[in-house]
Amino acid sequence: MKGLIALAALLASWAQAVAAEEGMDGAALYQQNCASCHGTELQGQPDWRSLGPDGRLPAPPHDATGHTWHHGDDILFRITRDGTAAVVGGGYESDMPGFGDSLRDAEIRAILDYIKSTWPERERAYQRERTQQE
């Protein structure tokens, strides 16, 4: 198990290095691909905890007031790449599309790194622990 955690940490740091080497700006990528739904300040949509008229939840905030930090890196990556419905399954419907066809893996990781960089240390520590438990 420790070997898997070490491997996951190594791969995550490698992806970050690739993103930095390729000059990827996670904040700019977020603004281009995510801000239209999740807000330019990561604030999400109003009443994000209540179902809308279409029966779907509005886009949640990605700042410390939301729940993004409650999830480990793997699930955050898969939701971003494949879309929420594909990851959650069971007929769950979501407006969150997958970006696997339009963003490279390193770009997705750069966006997630940007989001995580905005959280206070308490939320970052909790999220790191969740990642290690995956």
Model-derived segments and spans:
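Generic structural signal for secondary-structure transition and capping sites
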Residues: 42, 67, 84-85, 120
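Bacterial N-terminal signal peptides
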Residues: 5-14
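Gly/Gly-Pro-rich "capping" loops immediately C-terminal to redox-active cysteine motifs
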Residues: 27, 43-77, 98-102
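Stable alpha-helical elements in mature extracytoplasmic
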Residues: 22, 30, 72, 76, ...
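Short, cysteine/histidine-rich loop/knuckle motifs that typically chelate Zn2+
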Residues: 36
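Electrostatic cytochrome c docking/interface patches
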Residues: 13-30, 125-127, 134
